UniProtKB/Swiss-Prot annotation:
Subunit structure comment from the entry: Homodimer; disulfide-linked. Interacts with WFIKKN2, leading to inhibit its activity. Interacts with FST3.
Disulfide pattern: C272-C282, C281-C340, C309-C372, C313-C374
Effect seen on changing V316M: Increases SMAD3 protein signal transduction
Coiled-coil zones: none
Effect upon mutating A366G: Increases SMAD3 protein signal transduction
Full protein name: Growth/differentiation factor 8
Sorted UniProt keywords: Cleavage on pair of basic residues, Cytokine, Disulfide bond, Glycoprotein, Growth factor, Heparin-binding, Secreted, Signal
Organism, scientific name: Homo sapiens (Human)
Post-translational modification summary for this protein: Synthesized as large precursor molecule that undergoes proteolytic cleavage to generate an N-terminal propeptide and a disulfide linked C-terminal dimer, which is the biologically active molecule. The circulating form consists of a latent complex of the C-terminal dimer and other proteins, including its propeptide, which maintain the C-terminal dimer in a latent, inactive state. Ligand activation requires additional cleavage of the prodomain by a tolloid-like metalloproteinase.
Swiss-Prot/TrEMBL site (Cleavage) positions: R98, D99
Function: Acts specifically as a negative regulator of skeletal muscle growth.
Keyword Secreted part of the UniProt annotation: yes
Effect upon mutating E357Q: Increases SMAD3 protein signal transduction
């Protein structure tokens, strides 16, 4: 009995020494800890966002096989950008990448960009080929992207100057060849007749798929072409060497190539906004603005929704990843633990100038984060 009383006295003495318990103080301490945790999470997300933007810049250059961003000024872009129907349609119909994370659409598994449309502007020929004593338009160089993909369509676009009276125009496309013994320097590719009415000039397209395929098989035969568009009075209406006020009216080739996409599996994950207090691995919104980079060489989109992953991957949340959990249980010290990373990504379409001042319309894989998860 005396022993029990002694224990009670000791307990009471300890309570007196410890003093009264302030519940409000404990609540404030807990609140401060929570605030500190949220602040750390915000800082972590901001660092993750900055790293994601820098990674995107590196990935775009790498996937487009560019060592550095093309150095093309806005003035040069205004001169080179064709004022032509196919390009205007691409730009006008271009929609900022929508958040299509809910669908199960096809996506490309390849690392590098899959090209869909290439717009090639004329350049100076490697050969000094002259017809009638003066250089003739036009010579086109082709990138390896055309050579290693299936060409499904090739159109030559030419601009015809406006006429003052109704007239019939005879359009002729000639392929330049090495001079033959009889003096022949060209052979016909296409010819057509069309009626023009007074008003503005028009763009006319001509199918050149066959000659392009021949050029790709025998590059040495590509010496260029000559374009003629004569009206009834013998005036050449084709813009081959643009004069004053004719910027963007150069002839150009529109080449469409195709590649086969591959199907990938679907996954699910958490979606959060910037004000979310979610600590688990989650997908957060991120808009990449190319104009903010000074990347004027990207024609469209000027910005797109890239998104990024951030959050904790606690082992208590890993019933979905039993293999990772087992590894941690087997070797808790040697395992670095799972990371919050993209588990599904989708491509973006991009219209841009490459280093050779060619306009490319292509698909760049794995540029939009659709799902995040722990792995």
């Amino acid at each position: 009995m005396q022993k029990l009383q002694l224990c009670v006295y000791i307990y009471l003495f300890m309570l007196i020494v410890a003093g009264p318990v302030d519940l409000n103080e404990n609540s404030e301490q807990k609140e401060n800890v929570e605030k500190e945790g949220l602040c750390n999470a915000c800082t972590w997300r901001q660092n993750t966002k900055s790293s994601r933007i820098e990674a995107i810049k590196i990935q775009i250059l790498s996937k487009l096989r560019l060592e550095t961003a093309p150095n093309i000024s806005k003035d040069v872009i205004r001169q080179l950008l064709p004022k032509a129907p196919p390009l205007r349609e691409l730009i006008d119909q271009y929609d900022v990448q929508r958040d299509d994370s809910s669908d199960g659409s096809l996506e490309d598994d390849d690392y590098h960009a899959t090209t869909e449309t290439i717009i090639t502007m004329p350049t100076e020929s490697d050969f000094l080929m002259q017809v009638d004593g003066k250089p003739k338009c036009c010579f086109f160089k082709f990138s390896s992207k055309i050579q290693y993909n299936k060409v499904v369509k090739a159109q030559l676009w030419i601009y015809l100057r406006p006429v003052e009276t109704p007239t019939t125009v005879f359009v002729q496309i000639l392929r330049l060849i090495k001079p033959m013994k009889d003096g022949t320097r060209y052979t016909g590719i296409r010819s057509l007749k069309l009626d023009m009415n007074p008003g503005t000039g028009i763009w006319q397209s001509i199918d050149v798929k066959t000659v392009l395929q021949n050029w790709l098989k025998q590059p040495e035969s590509n010496l260029g072409i000559e374009i003629k568009a004569l009206d009834e009075n013998g005036h050449d209406l084709a813009v081959t060497f643009p004069g004053p006020g004719e910027d963007g009216l150069n002839p150009f080739l529109e080449v469409k190539v195709t590649d086969t996409p591959k199907r990938s599996r679907r996954d699910f994950g958490l979606d959060c906004d910037e004000h979310s207090t979610e600590s688990r691995c989650c997908r957060y919104p991120l808009t990449v603005d190319f104009e903010a980079f000074g990347w004027d060489w990207i024609i469209a989109p000027k910005r797109y929704k890239a998104n990024y992953c951030s959050g904790e991957c606690e082992f208590v949340f890993l019933q979905k990843y039993p293999h990772t959990h087992l590894v941690h249980q087997a070797n808790p010290r040697g395992s670095a633990g799972p990371c919050c990373t993209p588990t599904k990504m989708s491509p973006i379409n991009m219209l841009y100038f490459n280093g050779k001042e060619q306009i490319i319309y292509g698909k760049i894989p794995a540029m939009v984060v659709d799902r995040c998860g722990c792995s």
